[in-house]
């Protein structure tokens, strides 16, 4: 699958230090390569009660999450937001 970052996700990513950015990039590449295997596990869950269907969250680290959407027609993961667990769901 191809990864595409929203403008908000890119801005979110800039707030992390370089070591965390490398970890996030590595984990998101792993997600893109293994999405079907990870779907429905504790690491990747579909979000409920959101405005848009097919939104998921991905646990990158203990306190870091990514919110993303799957565009099934093009096999694309659109990364919507990246942030600390306490802030990313707002």
Q: Where are the model-predicted features located?
A:
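Basic, Lys/Arg-enriched alpha-helical interface segments
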Residues: 1-63, 70-77, 87-90
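Short, solvent-exposed aromatic-acidic interface loops
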Residues: 80-84
């Amino acid at each position: 699958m191809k990864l595409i970052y929203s403008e908000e996700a890119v801005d979110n990513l800039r707030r992390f230090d370089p070591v965390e950015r490398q970890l996030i990039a590595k984990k998101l590449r792993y997600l893109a390569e293994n999405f079907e295997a990870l779907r429905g596990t504790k690491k990747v869950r579909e979000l409920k009660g959101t405005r848009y269907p097919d939104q998921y969250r991905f646990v990158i680290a203990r306190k870091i999450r990514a919110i993303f959407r799957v565009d099934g027609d093009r096999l694309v993961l659109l990364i919507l937001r990246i942030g600390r667990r306490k802030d990313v769901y707002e």
